Structures are given as structure tokens and as C-alpha cells.
Amino acid sequence: MDNARLNSFLEYPILGSGDSGTCSARVYSSDHGITTFQSCAVSANSCGGDDRFLGGRGVQITSPHHHHHHHHHPQPATYQTSGNLGVSYSHSSCGPSYGAQNFSAPYGPYGLNQEADVSGGYPPCAPAVYSGNLSSPMVQHHHHHQGYAGGTVGSPQYIHHSYGQEHQSLALATYNNSLSPLHASHQEACRSPASETSSPAQTFDWMKVKRNPPKTGKVGEYGYVGQPNAVRTNFTTKQLTELEKEFHFNKYLTRARSEIAASLQLNETQVKIWFQNRRMKQKKREKEGLLPMSPATPPGSDEKTEESSEKSSSSPSAPSPASSTSDTLTTSH
């Protein structure tokens, strides 16, 4: 039993059969708010469309036509509503003395065990006995007996005795409101488990491979670890000191390049590049004013000095005159 049918109300149209009127029950859901349904009215064993039953909240309608009145013995009729309805019921077969009869129950989402305010001076149309709590009704239809079996509290019964023709089938219709997609999805979500355990994510071998691994530089020719093409010499303090001494006396290589390279454990290219960079740094500092201007040298003298140093390195070194005189002095002594 779903809770959507807790708030339901009953319609009791009058069906004429002989001299006695009978009531048939229809169960309507209260989710529609104000709804009008057509029912039959008693007029000389014929059904007409003069009587209407309107179920809603505080809405009353009465039938403008009144037919002849059949007297019945007043019998107590009580029932308990399980909804929040303000129902006005008026039937033409009960005559002028049977006016609008208000069934007022307090509005609430689960307003159970609420007895209807039925005036004893108005005779009912047929003997009807309601017992128990009408919650989640299950309709069972027979030709002579209609029963409501409560789902949660006890088993209440609505017993109806029909009079007259036995072949007349009393309509006991249950108005089932088709749920909207929103309600249907909500019910499916309620029926489904609250949370499903998700399987842990699998780690494959291809996911472990890094797309951009760090590049491992090879050890260069001069001990520099980096890109193979980028050759950069890291000079030691001793090498830098000796190179600065040579540069202080002469900004260009005067001694044999191979001799300087051999004494510093460097090659000739490294020494040449260092002197070139050192001269560029010297000129930059002079332009910035950090160092005094060095005596200007002719522009071609630099190249001539470099060329002469290269030639001297290629030819065997001849003894200088000072060294020769010193040698002669030592031999004479």
C-alpha cells in the first residue's frame, strides 16, 4: 500500500432501484484538489445528470432541482475519514428536507480517525455502516457486498445492502490518479537503494607511463650535465684566477694559447672563448662608467694580435733575448 492513497475521499452517488435508493462508493484521490464528478440521480427509476458531487476544500454546490421525496427510516451513519476534506453533498432524491450536508474534517497530511459531522435530522439514503480506519483501501467488488479492507490498522469493512433488482450491478469504481513523471521518478528513487558501492578505479599499465618524462642530459665533454648541444665550461677558481692574471696584463693572448690551455688543463678553444667574453664584459663596464676607459687600440690590432698568437703557438718557441743573455751569463760563470 502506498501512502499516496491515504488522503482519499469517497463519493456516494444515489442509484434508484424500486422505492429504495442505494448508495455506491467511489474512492477518489485528494491530490486533484477541486474535482467534479458526474453521478446518477433518482427520478422514477431512471438516472439523470441533475446531481453532482464536488470534492474539494471548502466548496459547496447544491442541485437546483428537487424531485419527489422517498421517506426512509433514519438510521445512524457514521464514518471516519482519512483525508483532509471539506465536502458538500446534496442529492435531489432526498427532497427538500435533506439539504446540503457538510462533511468537514480538519486539514492535515495524515488526518486519521476524524469523524464526520453528520446531522441526525437528515435521513441517509441507504443503510451504511462504516467501521475502522480507512487507510490504504483495497477495493473488493461483489454484486451485493462491497468491502474496504484497511491495510495498516485492523480490517475495517463497509457493508452495503442493495435493494431491488439483483441483476443491476452497483458500480464501485476506484479513481486511480496516474502519477506524474516527477512522482514516479521519486517513487523509483525511494525504492532503489540509497547508495551503491562503486567499484574502485582500476589502474592499468599504460596509465603509469608518464607522457613527458624529464630529459636526462648526457655528461658533456667538459663535465657539464645538460643538453648535448649546449656546451658550457664550468671553470674552477684556480683557472679563473690564472685567466684573470693573463687578461690583466694583456687583453689579448700574447702567449701561446696551447701553453695557457695546457697549464690550466683546458683546450685552446675554451681559453679563446673566455678571453672574448671577458673583453665584451670589460667594454660593457666601461660604457656603464664602472671602470675607467682603457687606452684605445687600433681596430685591426686585436685581430693581428690574435693571429700572431696563433702563429707563435704553431711555430716552435724561440728563446727570448733576455733568457739567452741569462744563459750566457750562467755559462760564463
Swiss-Prot record:
Residues 301-310 have a biased composition (Basic and acidic residues). Residues 64-74 have a biased composition (Basic residues). Residues 311-333 have a biased composition (Low complexity). Glycans are attached at residue 152. Residues 74-202 are annotated as: Interaction with OGT. The keyword Nucleus applies. GO terms for cellular component: nucleus. The gene is Hoxa1. This is Homeobox protein Hox-A1. Interacts with OGT (via TPR repeats domain); the interaction takes place mainly in the nucleus. Forms a DNA-binding heterodimer with transcription factor PBX1. One of its GO terms (biological process) is rhombomere 4 development. PROSITE patterns: HOMEOBOX_1, HOMEOBOX_2. GO terms for molecular function: DNA-binding transcription activator activity, RNA polymerase II-specific; DNA-binding transcription factor activity, RNA polymerase II-specific; identical protein binding; RNA polymerase II cis-regulatory region sequence-specific DNA binding; sequence-specific DNA binding; sequence-specific double-stranded DNA binding. InterPro entries: HD (IPR001356), Homeobox_CS (IPR017970), Homeodomain-like_sf (IPR009057), HXA1/B1/D1 (IPR046327). Sequence-specific transcription factor. Regulates multiple developmental processes including brainstem, inner and outer ear, abducens nerve and cardiovascular development and morphogenesis as well as cognition and behavior. Also part of a developmental regulatory system that provides cells with specific positional identities on the anterior-posterior axis. Acts on the anterior body structures. Seems to act in the maintenance and/or generation of hindbrain segments. Activates transcription in the presence of PBX1A and PKNOX1. Belongs to the Antp homeobox family. Labial subfamily. Pfam families: Homeodomain (PF00046). Residues 61-82, 279-333 are annotated as: Disordered. Keywords: Developmental protein, DNA-binding, Glycoprotein, Homeobox, Nucleus, Transcription, Transcription regulation. Glycosylated by OGT. It comes from the Eukaryota. It comes from Rattus norvegicus (Rat). SUPFAM superfamilies: Homeodomain-like. A motif (Antp-type hexapeptide) lies at residues 203-208. The keyword Transcription applies. It is found in: Nucleus.
